[in-house]
């Protein structure tokens, strides 16, 4: 009689930045069943269940935003193994190791390159992992471009009901298969429900590239300083994404740390780093332009403000929050305003579990469909080859450039001379790499702004 033998799922996550590693690793845990069974020939029945953990192997794609040791520690997500790889090295690894699930936590072009590279690497292979991809947070720009670059994965995760509807509309609109779109929620929501603190704490969640100009970033810092001086009884925190010299998902040309050096900061205003969840534990009012932290805050029912001072514009991303009830200005906050979020809007975003009478937006069940789809695909046996929408036929003037940036040919094979590491880099090479990254970040944060200002003269 066939019996079920439980085993741990083997999951691989490829990420290209600190936030995408966090999203990818937590998503892997959310969508992987706590128990996976495979059929074996046995005359005995076992009542044992599988270990609730998964075997998680992390791969960090080498590039400008490869997270530092400090950033990885701050995220706090543990993996059974974690190492830095080139694209070609990762593809080679995927032909050697057998995984059940592969999560591609990359920018759109990286996902597309890996889909074509994996399709080539797995040619003639009877089995392959379930391939999953998605977005780290709010999708407010380049919707069609980013989605079509992610097409071809078995599951394309949408972080809300609203996103799922938009994703399907894009795929169906170009004649692509939309069955991969799967509604979930952001995997890092959670934490204790909001309770008032003493002292009252205001947190401004800074973003690396929103707003972009020195004028706008200086304005926001000035208003934060003014708010702290106007309310000396409040603790005011400027929550920063990274320390000088580090990079995140988005390039930060004008760090707030640098701008703050020109201010005489009041005693009740501090610059802080650390895990956002831990900062939210002591937050009474979360203020941002369009950070995903707003959704984390709303999920915990913390009063949340999305600023309108610089306008409500697609370039800022705060247009995503139209209808949320959270839009307000610094003038309103200075006067003591606390917005009340719209329950229906919040439910459509997949946050604030159980906040509606219908139960929509329940976080506890948000990943159920994805888990079921992964389990179903794992039990089907041989999966079909990966078939992205973009091919040398559908996008002959676009796809080759996307793949070439990752040293892949139009058919997904490695280009001659593609960088690949067969062994761990020695101390000298590690120093050279760190120096190269430091030079790049220096150019982004110091040289580029100077050149831009000279061009404006």
Predicted regions and their residues:
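A nucleotide-sugar donor-handling region in carbohydrate enzymes
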Residues: 152-217
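A short, charged/proline- and glycine-enriched loop
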Residues: 2-11, 53, 194-202, 457
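C-terminal amphipathic helix plus adjacent low-complexity
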Residues: 334-457
């Amino acid at each position: 009689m066939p019996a079920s033998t439980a085993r741990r799922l083997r999951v691989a996550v490829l990420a290209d930045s600190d936030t995408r590693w966090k999203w990818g690793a937590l998503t892997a845990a959310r969508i992987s069943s706590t128990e996976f069974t495979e059929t074996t020939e046995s005359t005995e029945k076992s009542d044992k269940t599988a270990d609730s953990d998964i075997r998680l192997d992390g791969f960090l794609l080498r590039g400008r935003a490869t997270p530092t040791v400090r950033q990885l520690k701050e995220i706090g997500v543990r993996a059974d193994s974690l190492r830095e790889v080139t694209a070609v090295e990762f593809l080679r690894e995927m032909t050697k190791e057998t995984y059940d699930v592969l999560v591609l936590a990359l920018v759109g072009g990286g996902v597309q390159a890996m889909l074509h590279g994996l399709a080539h690497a797995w040619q003639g292979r009877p089995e392959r992992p379930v391939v999953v991809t998605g977005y780290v947070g709010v999708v407010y720009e380049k919707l069609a471009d980013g989605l079509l670059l992610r097409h071809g994965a078995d599951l394309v995760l949408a972080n809300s009901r609203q996103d799922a509807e938009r994703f399907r509309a894009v795929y169906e609109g170009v004649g692509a298969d939309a069955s991969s779109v799967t509604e979930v929620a952001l995997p890092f929501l959670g934490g204790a429900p909001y309770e008032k603190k003493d002292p009252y704490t205001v947190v401004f969640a800074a973003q690396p590239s929103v707003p972009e100009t020195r004028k706008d970033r200086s304005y926001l810092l000035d208003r934060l300083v003014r708010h702290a001086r106007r309310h000396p009884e409040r603790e005011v925190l400027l929550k920063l994404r990274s320390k000088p010299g580090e990079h995140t998902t988005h390039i930060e040309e004008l760090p707030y740390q640098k701008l703050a050096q020109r201010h005489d900061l009041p005693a009740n205003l501090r610059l802080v780093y650390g895990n956002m969840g831990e900062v939210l534990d002591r937050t009474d009012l979360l203020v941002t332009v369009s950070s995903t932290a707003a959704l984390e805050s709303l999920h915990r029912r913390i009063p949340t403000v999305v600023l309108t001072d610089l306008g409500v514009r697609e370039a800022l991303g705060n247009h995503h929050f139209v209808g949320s009830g959270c839009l307000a200005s610094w003038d309103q906050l200075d006067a003591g305003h606390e917005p009340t979020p719209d329950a229906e809007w919040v439910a459509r975003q997949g946050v604030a579990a159980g906040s509606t009478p219908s139960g929509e937006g329940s976080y506890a069940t948000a990943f159920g469909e994805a888990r079921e789809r992964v389990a179903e695909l794992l039990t089907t046996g041989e999966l079909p080859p990966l078939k992205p929408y973009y091919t040398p036929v559908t996008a002959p003037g676009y796809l080759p450039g996307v793949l070439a940036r990752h040293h892949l040919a139009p058919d997904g094979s490695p280009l001659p001379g593609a960088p690949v590491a067969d062994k761990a880099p020695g101390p000298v090479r590690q120093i050279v790499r760190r120096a190269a990254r430091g030079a790049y970040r220096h150019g982004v944060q110091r040289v580029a702004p100077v050149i831009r200002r000279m061009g404006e003269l």
